[in-house]
Amino acid sequence: MARTDNDTWDINESVGATALGVAGGRAAETRSADPLISDPYAKLFLEAAGDGIWRVYLDDELPAELVGADPQFEDRMQAMLGYTACRTKFFDDYFLAAAGEGIRQIVILAAGLDSRAWRLAWPAGCVVYEIDQPKVLEFKIGTLKSHAVDPIASHVSVGIDLRLDWPKALAQAGFDASAPTAWSAEGLLPYLTADAQGLLFDRIQSLSAPGSRVAVEAFTNEFFSPESFARREEQTERYRQAAIRLGGKDITESGNLLYEEERTEVVDWLQAHGWTVTAATSAEDLMAASNRAVPAGLDAAVPESVFVEGRLR
């Protein structure tokens, strides 16, 4: 289903379904022999979402139909699981470091099925604001409540599309723009138009007190190139056909969800707006540092991304 300016989604459709795939990666990492992260709640979301391609993450072995669709499928799957684990660890470490330095106001943009408010060891007094589509947040909170899981930090759900007036909704939920904030944008930017991405950062800027921090999964202009889009779609179509043979399960065509538009590099934007960029680590370097390097010869296995941290002067 192609995107529209005012589209919405539930957890098992469109952009919402991608959150289940990411939760699947965290669930697989959590039960691995030497996990980088621990997310005991990711599995609960997969089970609660019903039947769908995301349920392959609940099994230790991949279906033969998917493996047969691509001789490199298992290696690609492991690379993406490694990417998800390293990305999760990056943001986990960022938030705990910010809280350790005294920041008590956290805003997770496009929170999806992230469960950091429930699983990280937050210091007393931390408030975690989560912004996402209302149905996505309702599914997450309802699932956790049904398993008697309570948040460790004070948790505030802000159900609103990031293309709408979320700063107003955030303020109405209790956000204090005069206090330093730790912001995150994880797995978000390609789902926004270039203009919407610019507006997102303008709004972060307007709400950030000095001393605020931001962490971003930024994507290079190579990621947004027609060649990269075509390559990803060719791979996805092969997997989609295999998933259908697996039993009618479907894989969303990523090209229908992402916006193929070049945009201002995040590092450049931050530096031009008074932020000190304290880290800008490529996905390859991030993964290699955690012994999750992509095997040589495995092309386009993970997104062309850079993990960026900044502090507002």
Swiss-Prot record:
GO BP annotations, alphabetical order: methylation
Residue ranges of coiled coil: none
Source domain of life: Bacteria
Record bears the keyword Transferase: yes
UniProt-annotated binding residues for S-adenosyl-L-methionine: D132, D161, L162
Role according to the record: Exhibits S-adenosyl-L-methionine-dependent methyltransferase activity.
Protein name: Putative S-adenosyl-L-methionine-dependent methyltransferase MAV_2576
Organism, as annotated: Mycobacterium avium (strain 104)
